[in-house]
Amino acid sequence: MSESPDFADFVRCQSSALLRSAWLLTGGDWALAEDLVQTALSEVWKRWERISGMEAPDAYAHKVMVNTFLRWRGRRWTGEIASARIPETGAVAGGFGQVDTRESLRRALRELTARQRAVIMLRYFEDRSEAETAAIMGCSVGTVKSQSAKALARLRHVPGLAEVLTGGSTC
């Protein structure tokens, strides 16, 4: 069965945005993010005739991806191994501040629960409302608010991220 030209165009236009969101959901694991996008797009493709007529098929694809991720978290081992040793997070001389911040963010995202990561990605990366986030995740607005508050509180305690979250200088 060959894919329709419309679906190929959809994938070409949406795959980068889906991959960026998936990277955040997976805590910075590119390989797992690619698997997540591929799985979500295969689900979208199965229903493409119905989905292509929707007002926002990209929103549907994001919803499929988030729900797939939340299902995976219950049964997949991602290779993450907890460590009692806290890594150094101090700035490295030579202009690597952005790399340090990105690495701090990646580690911090892995410390969040899957639901907290999904809320942070939908609310602050994709700039969705609380109601939209709740609809995508299949939960109440109150759950979105509480998960968001808990996640942000955890992220504020990560060295190197406090300045980013509060808008201060990272230098």
Predicted segments with their positions:
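Acidic, proline/glycine-rich intrinsically disordered inter-domain spacer in sigma factors
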Residues: S2, R75, I81-R110
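DNA-recognition helix of helix-turn-helix
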Residues: V66, M137-L161
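Structural recognition of an alpha-helix C-terminal capping motif at a helix-to-coil junction
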Residues: D35-S42, K46, E55-N67
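Short, charged helix-capping/linker segments at alpha-helix termini
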Residues: M1-D9, L19-T39, E49-E55
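Short amphipathic alpha-helical boundary/capping segments
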Residues: D9, S104-T113, L155
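Arg/Lys-rich amphipathic alpha helix in sigma70-family domain 2
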Residues: E49-G53, K63-A84, G97-Q98
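C-terminal edge and immediately downstream basic/flexible tail or linker adjoining helix-turn-helix-like DNA-binding
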Residues: D6, L152-C171
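A short pre-motif secondary-structure segment
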Residues: V119-R123
